[in-house]
Design a protein with these regions (language model features):
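N-terminal Rossmann-like dinucleotide-binding module
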Residues: 1-35
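Internal alpha/beta domain cores that form substrate/cofactor-binding pockets in large enzymes
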Residues: 21-25, 54-73, 78, 85-104
Length: 179
């Protein structure tokens, strides 16, 4: 599993509570926050540590060290939700069935960062959460599941939170179907 912000937590929790084994969590390193500039682990790192899942914190998936850790767990499938970086081709090939990604937009319209904010800013009436087979490139690959979401008066944060909650079961459905 690869993810960093709070939006990735519902999917991590759902996978951990399911019949699927989460063998490694990859996330960004602790970040400084607040007036005291205290280092805080990512929300994903906190949840994984409490669940007893091995955590690898890295700013890049291109290093040999992180590649070795991913290869060592011999995962069947990788799941990505808002990790915050591109996955290099060598790492994409490590899990037996590759990687799936939950993206909070109607692909391919809003590939990349801040898709919910862009959909709202551009006045879209709807968006979608998409689970897709991750390929080399930015948010590219065959879409396995698309769930349309109406954009109302909620803030981008509220809409993202709702999509993150709903997206967790969407990911589980796709992962179950790939077995």
């Amino acid at each position: 599993f690869a993810g960093t912000p709070e939006a990735a937590v519902p999917t991590l929790r759902a996978l951990h509570a399911s019949s699927h084994e989460v063998v490694l969590v990859i996330t960004r390193p602790p970040a400084r926050r607040g007036r005291g500039k205290t280092l805080y682990p990512s929300p994903v790192a906190e949840v994984a540590a409490r669940a007893g899942v091995e955590v690898a914190e890295t700013t890049t998936l291109k290093s040999a060290q992180i590649g070795e850790r991913i290869a060592a767990v011999a995962a069947d499938l990788g799941v990505v939700v808002a990790y915050g970086g591109l996955i290099p081709p060598a790492v994409l090939q490590m899990p037996t069935h590759g990687w799936v990604n939950l993206h909070f937009s109607d692909l391919p319209r809003w590939r990349g960062a801040a898709p919910v904010q862009w959909a709202i800013r551009e006045g879209d009436a709807t968006t979608a959460s998409c689970v897709f087979h991750l390929e080399e490139g930015l948010d590219t690959g065959d879409v396995y599941s698309r769930v349309e979401v109406r954009i109302g008066r909620e803030s981008a944060g509220e809409l993202l939170d709702a999509m993150a909650q709903a997206g967790a079961s969407q990911v589980l459905d796709v992962v179950d179907g790939l077995q």
